A protein has these predicted regions:
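N-terminal Rossmann NAD(P)H-binding glycine-rich loop of SDR-like oxidoreductase domains
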Residues: 5-26
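Conserved glycine-rich Rossmann-like NAD(P)H-binding loop of the short-chain dehydrogenase/reductase
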Residues: 28-45
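Conserved residues in the N-terminal Rossmann fold of short-chain dehydrogenase/reductase
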Residues: 37, 61-62, 102
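Short, conserved SAM-binding/catalytic segment
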Residues: 46-55
Length: 154
């Protein structure tokens, strides 16, 4: 599925992103594996962990899912997008509601818009159990994010 494909991972430097990248590199031969993240320190650490000498497919793209133009640029020529970017710490979300809303909801909307604009074949968006019956802002934003992706699929 991922052999000889261009894959972009939003939030690629996070816990899921790191494990996903490692799995892809061990099981497939992607043409390009692009890490899209706003954390340049973690990108630098990943570049050391997944050295370009050994993994020629690795690319790093500093950006934020809240920035539609940057996201659209990053998705040019991409076949698959794995959307893992999120503000996910429940307590942080409660004290920074607009950051959570802008990242989790606005970011999801931007991923859909950019993917459609760039003719991406498939987008896989991560969710959480907290979206099934939300009792906090994080869960509510992830439920809304899920609805955005479902709606875009119709």
């Amino acid at each position: 599925m991922f052999n000889n494909k261009n894959i972009l991972v939003t939030g690629g430097t996070g816990s899921f992103g790191n494990l996903f990248v490692e799995t892809i590199l061990n099981k497939f031969k992607p043409k390009k594996l692009i890490i899209f993240s706003r954390d340049e320190l973690k990108q630098s650490q990943m570049a050391q962990k997944f050295s370009s000498d050994k993994y020629k497919c690795m690319r790093y793209f500093v950006g934020d899912v809240r920035d539609l133009d940057r996201l659209t640029l990053a998705m040019q020529g991409v076949d698959y997008v794995i959307h893992a970017a999120a503000l996910k710490q429940v307590n942080i979300a409660e004290y920074n509601p607009m950051e959570c809303i802008n990242t989790n909801i606005g970011g999801a909307e931007n991923v859909v818009k950019a993917a459609l604009s760039a003719n991406v074949l498939k987008v896989i968006a991560l969710s959480t159990d907290k979206a099934s019956d939300p009792i906090n802002l994080y869960g509510a934003t992830k439920l809304t994010s899920d609805k955005i992706f479902i709606s875009a699929n119709n």
